[in-house]
Amino acid sequence: MPPTAPPEKMMFQLILRRRGISDQAVLRAMEEVPREEFVLPADRADAYRDSAMAIACGQTISQPFVVAYMTEQLKLQKSHRVLEIGTGSGYQAAVLARLTDHVLTVERFRTLADRARERLEKLNCFNVEVMLGDGYALPAGAGQFDRIIVTAAMEDIPQSLLDRLEPDGILIAPVGPHHGVQRLVRVTRTGDRFDRKELVDVRFVPAIPGIAREL
C-alpha cells in the first residue's frame, strides 16, 4: 500500500490481515477497489469500517472481511468464469474483476443493477457483465461457470445452480434461515459429486426468487 494511503484505508488492510486474510492477490484487490464509491453518500466517511452498511432497495453492502473471506475461499485464477448472484452495490463484483477475466453478476432490482453498472464502468471494470435477472432461474444461454458466489442467504442451494458449476468448480453461499444467522458453505464439484463444507457463521439479506416489480 502506498505510504500516502489514508489512515482509515491502512487500518482496513491491517484488520483484514489480522482476521486471517492472507492471499496477497485478494488483499491487493481489496486495496484497489474504493469502497467509498459503493456506499450511500452519507456513509462515505465510514466506508472503511469493517461492517455491513445499508444501500438502496432495502439491501446491504457486505462487511469487507466477509467480502475478502468469500473471495479467498473461491481460489480464483485469471482464466475463471465467475457468476455472482446478488450484485447489490457492485462492490463484490469490482473485487472479483481484479482477480479474474470474466464476471457475470445478476441482480433482481433494476435500480441496483443500473447503479452498479455505472460504478463498475467508472472504475473500468469492463470484464463485468451486469444482468437484471433471477438468480434462481438463469437463462439457458448463461452457460457454465468455474466459480459461483452467492451474496444473499438461501435456505438451500438449488441443484439447478450447482449444475452450473464446471468440473472442479467451487460455489460459495450463505445457507440458512432468511432472518438470523446462516452458515457460509463452500461446495466443490468433482465429476457428478458435490462436496460440501461449512465454514463460518454469517448474516445476509435473503435471496428472493424473481425480478422485483418495483425499484
UniProtKB/Swiss-Prot annotation:
BP term (GO), one: methylation
Gene Ontology CC: cytoplasm
Localization terms from the record: Cytoplasm
Keywords: Cytoplasm, Methyltransferase, S-adenosyl-L-methionine, Transferase
GO molecular function: protein-L-isoaspartate (D-aspartate) O-methyltransferase activity
InterPro entries associated with the record: PCMT, SAM-dependent_MTases_sf
Listed EC numbers: 2.1.1.77
HAMAP family: PIMT (MF_00090)
Protein name (record): Protein-L-isoaspartate O-methyltransferase
Source organism (scientific name): Bradyrhizobium sp. (strain ORS 278)
